[in-house]
From Swiss-Prot:
Comp. bias (Polar residues): 92-101
Name listed for the protein in its UniProt record: NEDD4 family-interacting protein 2
Membrane-spanning residues: 207-227, 233-253, 263-283
Residue segments, region Disordered: 1-133
Gene this protein is translated from: Ndfip2
Biased composition (Low complexity): 7-22, 38-47, 102-120
Presence of keyword Phosphoprotein: yes
Chain ranges for the short sequence motif PPxY motif 1 as given in the UniProt record: 123-126
Annotated organism of origin: Mus musculus
Superkingdom: Eukaryota
Modifications the protein undergoes after translation, according to the UniProt entry: Ubiquitinated by NEDD4 and NEDD4L; which does not affect turnover. Also ubiquitinated by ITCH. Undergoes transient tyrosine-phosphorylation following EGF stimulation, most probably catalyzed by SRC. Phosphorylation on Tyr-126, Tyr-146 and Tyr-152 are dependent on the phosphorylation on Tyr-142. Also phosphorylated by LYN and FYN.
Tissue expression pattern: Ubiquitously expressed, with highest levels in brain, liver, kidney and testis.
Amino acid sequence: RRSASDAELSAGAEGATGSEAAPPGDLGGRTRGGGRGSAAAAATTSTREAEGAERRGDTPARKPDPEAGRMDHHQLGTGRYQVLHNEEDNSESSAVEQPSTSSLAAPTVEAAASAPALDPDSPPPYSSITVEAPTTSDTDVYSEFYPVPPPYSVATSLPTYDEAEKAKAAALAAAAADAPQRNQEEDCTPRDDFSDVEQLRVGNDGIFMLAFFMAFIFNWLGFCLSFCITNTIAGRYGAICGFGLSLIKWILIVRFSDYFTGYFNGQYWLWWIFLVLGLLLFFRGFVNYLKVRNMSESMAAAHRTRYFFLL
């Protein structure tokens, strides 16, 4: 480009010099010839300079084309940057963003061809990432830690605060009423290997008669043995009844015997006291035993209780 511009400047300078050096007389005739000669000389000079530039390896300068510059700039920009499209609008953009001319198709193909070889360390494109669907185990874990709320119909049908408090009070009252009966049933659990009389520790008539005769015959010694050995109501009440009758027996023996006349002379009130005490012991043991036996037979099975009559 510099050689071509230098050639033009030199040609212009020579033409101007030739026109100034011409004499005034020959101005009219030489004007035409001088103009032609200057033009021929300029052409020859430019041709020589162009050949010299070609020999040196330089190309003659040409007028820059603005369209070509724009195309080169577009190609450089397209090759350097990659055009990305949205995945969701991929189908729509493929139909809308088509190239209008053949000049835009070539840069797009070049950009697509050069895109995979940009950088091996760059992350993969978003379209190559596959999203895994949630499995049933993840769904179960999510529902376990975050339970699903109840539907609107269930949430609106819940009782009010007053109704909930009344229901709670009724439940507490029912539990308090059932507690004594439950404790009583636990304390008095029925046993199949014993009869009802043995379960209540009432005893039977045989034990009552055995303790009665033991206390009646052996007096106070029999009373102590029968009362301490037996652990039933029949045996203890039999011992009390026999001891009372034994006391009455000895009072009558002492009163109507000639051997003990000196002991009760003038003291009749003393033997009356022992006689009444013996009668009370006899009737108390006999009546209480009959009462307990009848009560044990008439009681319901769920409300039976063990009775211990300790004196």
